[in-house]
Amino acid sequence: AGGRGAGAGLGYFALNPSQAPAVVRSTLSSVGLIEEGPPPTPTCPLTGLPAPHGQVPDRPVLAIKVENYPDARPQAGLSSADIVYEELVEGGITRFVVLYQCHDAPRVGPVRSARTADPDILAAFGRPILAYSGGAPNVVRVVNEADLIPIDETRGGDAFTRDPSRPAPHNLYAS
C-alpha cells in the first residue's frame, strides 16, 4: 500500500528509539541496536525540574489559597511554589492558588478563603490538600464535597498562625 513495509517502520524506531513502543525498544535493545544509559533523573511532576535530593516526595500536592489584595503584600512563600495560579475572585481582585509538591516554604500567606473554582483548578492533581481560611457556606460545601483534602484554620492546628504585626484579615499564614 504506501510503499513502506515493516522494515521501514522498525528502521525508524532504530534511529529514533525514544519514539518506539516499549516492546519494540526491548527487542531492539536485546539485539544491540539501542545503548542503555543510566536511569533517568527523577523529576518533579509539576515543574519537570530535577527532584530535590534525587527523589520526588511521596505526598499529595499541597495547595494554599493566598491573598493578592494590595494590603496583603508582600506575600510569603510564592517564590518556593512549584506552580502559582492567579484567579479572578471579584471586583478585579485576584487570589493565588499556590501549589507545592517537591518544594516547601517555611511560611505561606496571607491565607484567605476558598472559592468554588478551586476544586476544578485542583482536579488535575489527584487528591490534593487544600489549605484555606473559610469561605461562604456554599463554597465550603463545594470544597468539602470535592475530591480533595480540605484543611482550614479551624482544622489545621499549628499549621496556621496569625502574625500580630499585620492587620486582620491579612495576617493568617500556613507553615
Regions found by a protein language model. Name each.
Residues G3-R25:
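Hydrophobic single-pass membrane-insertion segments
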Residues A20-I83, E90-S175:
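A surface/extracellular/periplasmic glyco- and lipid-processing/surface-interacting theme
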